[in-house]
Amino acid sequence: MVISARAKIMLLETQNLAIGYEGKTLVQHIQFTLEENQICCLLGANGAGKSTFLKTLLGLQPPIGGDIVWQGKSLSDYSPTELARHIAYVPQAHSHLFPFLVQDMVMMGRSAFLKWYQTPKKSDLDLALMALQELEIAHLAQRYYHQLSGGEKQLVLIARAIAQQAKLLIMDEPTSSLDFGNQIRVLEKIKQLQKQNIALIISTHNPQQAAFLGDNIVLLDQQFGFQQGDKKHLLTLENLAKIYRTSPELLHQHLNNHIEKSL
């Protein structure tokens, strides 16, 4: 008897999406798809529209045109609270003005499941502590977030998203302000999340990180538009040279052939 593999479930797709702000269109004709348990890395130069694309997918910025569909339903039909139960956002590690304990920062991921008058329950605290344990940072639970290192802060923000129990995590340059060791630690944790049936969209400036993480790549550029595909076909020196306005020869020199070797 032949047992066929289970078909992947489509989580997110865009239909002729146009993105921009204040009425100005940055990129249009975006046909994007994301399946469950898929990592998609988003590459583009500064000002290409990466952050605008992510904000639009998160429902924080309205599209200029087209539609975004989450599990067969238009994103516009979800309330912000409903959407937060499905999609979590992981920003870059940042300083915080208020002295929150790490466990309290992570418990904020449970806010989408609470009424405005409710306080977190023991079950919410348990989920927060489980998320910290999962990332091997449970020892930070009683530390103050603002006193942590950049790498520790980034892992706490990822733990907050895990506590949110979302099916999709959207990360905006999660390693941009980290030293090399912390970059490696964060990247390894991201790979582990995929094994837990979590889909991820990750914006990065680093093609080598995209080659390591992504089974799917998006190239975003105002001149060349939107391209999505597997890394073998898209993550080439020629394509990178186009979006970063440089030459394939210089890229080859500075990347030490890592892109080609990774394929």
UniProtKB/Swiss-Prot annotation:
UniProt-listed InterPro entries: AAA+_ATPase (IPR003593), ABC_transporter-like_ATP-bd (IPR003439), ABC_transporter-like_CS (IPR017871), Metal_Ion_Import_ABC (IPR050153), P-loop_NTPase (IPR027417)
Record's keyword annotation contains DNA repair: no
Keyword Cell inner membrane applies: no
Pfam family, one: ABC_tran
Family under the similarity heading: Belongs to the ABC transporter superfamily.
Official protein name in the record: Uncharacterized ABC transporter ATP-binding protein HI_1272
Species assigned in the record: Haemophilus influenzae (strain ATCC 51907 / DSM 11121 / KW20 / Rd)
Superkingdom classification of source: Bacteria
SMART domains recorded: AAA (SM00382)
A cellular-component GO term for this protein: ATP-binding cassette (ABC) transporter complex
Key words, A-Z: ATP-binding, Nucleotide-binding, Transport
Domain (ABC transporter): residue spans on this chain: 12-247
One GO MF term attached to the UniProt entry: ATP hydrolysis activity
SUPFAM superfamilies linked: P-loop containing nucleoside triphosphate hydrolases
Binding positions for ATP per the UniProt entry: G44, A45, N46, G47, A48, G49, K50, S51
